[in-house]
């Protein structure tokens, strides 16, 4: 008897269901796949070096041969015939080394494809990753932070290890542009068929774009977009080398970039979910009261950009609980006791009075956004409570103490006239006193005052200066005062010049 078409389709679907559920998973692993396997959501690509920055081939210049083959794109397969290989040799007293430039800041590691060697045993090498030539040449000091030394506290960048005679090996997980390889094994010769950087990234389209008649400004825009793109790992990091953590304050300018360049991306809601799980109330986000304020601002901006009411409702209890937590720490006279430590960003930390004024403005901003969130959630009592907190905070408005971070927040929140804020401090000295985190809010203050040309000039001066020094992504910290007599990051530092990364960076 012939089965009815609908029944036949149902039986076929039932039979095929297990195969569909485990599609792409080897049969041997399928029984445990749901319990122990997590799919890697990131993409990988292999990148050939763009140039050889320096090499040490011994006093007779004979320890390295045919290094130009490393600049050719390979197929990733090892070979034992030693054809088209870079040959590196060491003696008792001299060790060959190469320093490679991959052209742009990357996140990932390194892949060595071997072409055999003079030893049956593995050979000892030292591999140093660097965001600058200076860092790739530097010595590590992990016991204490010292100028001119590098650290491995967030991502291992200085690795001494054995590599195989044949085959291939992958090393590292960090942020870098440069790699130095030293052959430490005495009296050994190794053949390197390929040295490739492993780029680990999200394969997503650039939906937003910016183009004008100022090519420097165009390059600044795309560099900012790429900087954030690299930080979009499984979660949204503050940086690909350090700290590699979801910081709720650093997230805000990243969120604004993502929404304009990439549109909706799950890295934002996933990171906000993770933050709430890591720091349940009454804990402060990242252990910092200021970053709980940024959480509310981030929630508002994400809803404003996406209209995702379901995600907002998912966080309604946390939002309400945080509003009530803050309310209990602001008295009727406008005095607040959220936490003993006040924080805006690291460059401003020395100006205690200015930070205090800016921190209070940040509370007002967070409550303004929390008011809107509460209305969207239909929680009118919380919405009114936010207004009450704002009114109490406005009873005690402190001076900015010539701190650009503070004046910018005060202008954004309406605690200070934007034009006055710009005239008194934000515009003074142009890009001097700007920072890589709070520079966004300084530009917002300039825009509120209608100072658009001034803002563009500062963008070209401050962010453009990093490009002039060889940056391919923007740095965690930067100050225009560092520029005089500074060497670029993409060449060895000459004697008498400042190492802008080693002397000032991390």
Predicted regions and their residues:
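Bacterial N-terminal signal peptides that target proteins for export
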Residues: 1-12
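Extracellular/oxidizing-compartment recognition motifs
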Residues: 24-234, 250, 266-268, 310, ...
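Bacterial N-terminal signal peptides
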Residues: 10-20
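Active-site core of glycosidic bond-cleaving carbohydrate-active enzymes
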Residues: 247-253, 257-506
């Amino acid at each position: 008897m012939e089965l009815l078409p609908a029944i036949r389709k149902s039986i076929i679907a039932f039979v095929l269901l297990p195969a569909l559920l485990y599609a792409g998973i080897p049969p041997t692993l399928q029984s445990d796949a749901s319990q122990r396997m997590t799919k890697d959501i990131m993409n990988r690509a292999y990148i050939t070096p763009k140039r050889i920055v320096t090499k040490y081939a011994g006093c007779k210049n004979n320890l390295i041969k045919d290094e130009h083959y490393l600049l050719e794109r390979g197929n990733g397969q090892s070979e034992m015939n030693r054809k088209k290989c870079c040959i590196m040799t060491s003696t008792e007293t001299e060790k060959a080394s190469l320093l490679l430039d991959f052209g742009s800041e990357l996140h990932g590691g390194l892949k060595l494809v071997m072409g055999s060697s003079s030893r049956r045993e593995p050979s000892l090498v030292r591999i140093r990753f660097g965001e600058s030539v200076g860092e790739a040449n530097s010595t590590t000091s992990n016991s204490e932070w010292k100028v001119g030394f590098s650290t491995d506290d967030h991502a291992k960048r200085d690795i001494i290890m054995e590599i195989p005679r044949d085959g291939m090996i992958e090393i590292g997980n960090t942020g870098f542009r440069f790699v130095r390889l030293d052959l430490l094994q005495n009296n050994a010769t190794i053949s390197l068929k390929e040295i490739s950087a492993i780029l680990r990234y999200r394969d997503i389209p650039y939906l937003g774009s910016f183009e004008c008649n100022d090519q420097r400004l165009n390059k600044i825009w795309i560099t900012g977009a790429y900087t954030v793109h690299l930080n979009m790992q499984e979660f949204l990091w503050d940086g690909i080398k350090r700290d590699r953590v979801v910081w709720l304050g650093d997230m805000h300018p990243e969120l604004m970039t993502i929404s304009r360049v990439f549109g909706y991306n799950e890295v934002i809601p996933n990171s906000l979910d993770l933050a709430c799980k890591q720091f349940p109330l009454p804990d402060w986000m990242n252990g910092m009261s200021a970053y709980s304020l940024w959480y509310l601002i981030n929630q508002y901006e994400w809803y404003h950009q996406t209209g995702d009411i379901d995600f907002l409702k998912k966080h309604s209890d946390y939002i309400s609980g945080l509003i009530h937590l803050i309310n209990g720490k602001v008295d009727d006279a406008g005095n607040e006791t959220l936490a003993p430590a006040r924080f805006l960003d690291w460059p401003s930390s020395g100006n205690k009075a200015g930070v205090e004024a800016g921190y209070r403005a940040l509370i007002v901003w967070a409550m303004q956004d929390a008011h809107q969130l509460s209305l969207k959630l239909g929680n009118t009592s919380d919405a009114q409570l936010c207004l009450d907190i704002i009114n109490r905070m406005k009873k005690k408005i402190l001076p900015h103490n010539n701190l650009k971070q503070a004046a910018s927040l005060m202008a954004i929140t309406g605690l200070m006239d934007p034009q006055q804020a710009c005239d008194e401090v934000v515009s003074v000295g142009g890009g001097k006193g700007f920072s890589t985190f709070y520079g966004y809010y300084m530009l917002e203050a300039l825009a509120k005052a209608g100072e658009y040309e001034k803002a563009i000039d500062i963008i070209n001066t401050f962010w453009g200066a990093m490009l002039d020094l060889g940056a391919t992504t923007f740095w965690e910290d930067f100050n225009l005062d560092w520029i005089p007599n500074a060497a670029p990051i993409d060449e060895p530092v000459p004697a008498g010049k400042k190492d802008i990364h080693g002397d000032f960076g991390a």
